[in-house]
Amino acid sequence: MAFTLYSLLQAALLCVNAIAVLHEERFLKNIGWGTDQGIGGFGEEPGIKSQLMNLIRSVRTVMRVPLIIVNSIAIVLLLLFG
């Protein structure tokens, strides 16, 4: 299998899908990444854990409808061109 731009885009789509389906109460809370975790004090830089949680929440909020559309396009392309 050749490494093409389509393969790279499909891999990125799979990674974004993986982030989007993480359920906060079922999975993230069990590993200590739930919403009840403290952010930190005033004036402190947010840690990597809080930044990753913010990224996951943002992807789940913003990318819901675009992911449905992009996944549909990817399925149609796979059905048409194999």
Swiss-Prot record:
Tissue: Highest levels in heart, skeletal muscle, and kidney.
GO cellular component, one term: endoplasmic reticulum membrane
Cellular compartments annotated: Endoplasmic reticulum membrane
Membrane topology type: Multi-pass membrane protein
Phylogenetic classification of the source organism: Eukaryota, Metazoa, Chordata, Craniata, Vertebrata
Keywords for the protein's UniProt record, in alphabetical order: Diabetes mellitus, Disease variant, Endoplasmic reticulum, Epilepsy, Membrane, Protein transport, Transmembrane, Transmembrane helix, Transport
KW Nucleotide-binding (keyword) present: no
Single Gene Ontology BP annotation: type B pancreatic cell differentiation
Gene that this sequence comes from: IER3IP1
Protein name in the entry: Immediate early response 3-interacting protein 1
